[in-house]
Amino acid sequence: MKKHIFYFILTFVTVQMSFAGSISEYAVIKGTISIPDFQTKEVTLYNVEDGKPAVAATAKVNPLGEFGFMTPVSAAGFYYIDYGQFKNRTQLIRLYLEPKLDINLVINKEHYVLSGKNVGQNVLVQKANEIYNEFAPFARLGGNVTYVDFYPWLDKGVAKANEFSKTINTKDANFNKLLKLAVATDVEESTYTFFRMPRTAFPDKDDRPAVIKTWQTDKKFTDPDLLKLHNGVALMSNYFFYVSVSGAAVPKRLDIVETLDHITDPALKDVYLRDVVANSRMKIEEYEKIAPSIKPYMISATSKSFLLEYEKVLHKNVGQKGLDFTYNDINNKPVSFSDFKGKYVYIDLWATWCGPCKAEIPHMKKIEEDYHGKNIVFVSLSLDKPKDAQKWKDFVTKEQLKGIQLMADKDFGSDVAKNYDVNAIPRFLLFDTKGNIINSDALRPSNPELREQLDKLLKS
């Protein structure tokens, strides 16, 4: 018994927090992981910040599988236990923490046992978690389920969730509202995520469960409490993705401000746009086009700080001198970047094995033809492996590729790939007449806006 107490105290010591306040301001969680061959040495406690999980504390797991948290709770809300299962949706352990709670958890592989001196609303929350877990296999990466399995099950799953929501009727109105929102969000977010996962069988584009159509409304996102849920932002993101792939009218990335017509709450707009910008990998030109439309909605201090850093990174290479590389053409003649001084230079980094690269070739040919004789050079620089040099030469000849055709010396280990942090292709680079960088992640030939940019440069 003393050994158990000793190890449990150690787990609390590892949690970095101040105990200046009264014990009544804290919630206590004591846990034991009872999973055979369990290896994880640390457990994370998440809270929620702006609709996403955020680390609140960590605790070491002792050799007996025990861990513990004594966490300050300034406002009641959802927290999440992660022992390695959280991201892959193996088991949701969501707790509604309030001051003075004293919770015990015994965690098994597929469920957990809840007990303690004061568990608050968490018996009800556990039932909500069980519903989430039933949806999880359909939203898990690597799952073998398809629409053949999911569609017949969905109506039953939704009905069960709706029936459960009717039983949420405690004396705490705020809790009732938040848990009902959580259940609805779990169901919808898991369903929309299903359509983002790779599958072995696919329904027709217009073959969608009828229940999903009832979730689509003109003013979809109105409740700022969505930002109190770990999957709040994910729901918004997955919803707009689902609508786009289902053939309904939804804005493309550069028209993303139009999606805000479906979001009425200012805080939701702010957080959603921040997530879009952070994850969309926009080119400089794309961002500059959309920025004036979205910045008026990104009003929080967090978003303003984010945009400041985002723009700094986006423009970090602009104006810097381009790498003066030298590589051979198909006749083994060395060609250097400096040979093009005085002209604009557009470089296509590609390889013969790259499908998306080859899809750009017709567009590249056309743009080279249309800008022939103008003050711009088009360079195609292959990142094929050195052993495939002849394969590259044969491809260039067979496809009658125009412009300047070069091959790097060490594929992705070559100086040009390392200098511009190239880890995926196709990748395009654009330089001014002095050899300085205009964009080290330029627009593709297939993007009509590239022509607008080139025309503007050539007129200046």
Regions found by a protein language model. Give the residues of each.
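A non-transmembrane, solvent-exposed segment enriched in polar/low-complexity residues
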Residues: 21-178, 182, 189-193, 200-204
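Bacterial Sec-dependent N-terminal signal peptides
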Residues: 1-26, 457-460
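Short, internal strand/loop/helix patches
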Residues: 328, 393-429, 433
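Alpha-helical repeat scaffolds
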Residues: 202-216, 251-259, 286-295
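Thiol-based oxidoreductase modules, predominantly thioredoxin-like and allied folds used
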Residues: 375-389, 401-412
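N-proximal helix/coil linker or "cap" segments that precede and/or mark the start of modular domains
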Residues: 266-328, 333, 338-343, 369, ...
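Conserved redox-active cysteine motifs that mediate thiol-disulfide chemistry
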Residues: 341-342, 349-366, 380
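Non-catalytic, surface beta->alpha helical segment in thiol-disulfide oxidoreductase systems
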Residues: 424-425, 436-460
